[in-house]
Amino acid sequence: MPEYTFLVVEDSPTMRQLISFALKRIPGSTIVEAGDGIDALKKLSNQKFDVILTDINMPLMDGLKLVSMVRNDPTYKDIPVIVITTEGADDARERGISLGANAYVSKPIQTQDLLNTVNEIIKSKA
């Protein structure tokens, strides 16, 4: 069974738990959580991840800055990134994709939509 390690970057503990709980449905998954982009970069420097899922609106370092930094770092640039946006936040979603995000999921998060998006990313990476 393949194993996947996901980095969930979200400032809301409730939303982080919701996303992590959904990802646990993927067999062989390990989930690591970060509360903002700075925390995410620390975790990236210490562990290998298969997919990063990041909220856009966060304190200290937002998800758009994180996407940009990941894409511009040779160590992390090939890790798929899924941005999580508020429904109707078309500008932020488009900016995330233009900065190099592979996909997006809108809030409120529908578990099946999240899992479908993650599974598509995993399959394309294989």
Region roles according to the model:
Residues L53-D55:
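Active-site T/S-Asp motif of two-component receiver
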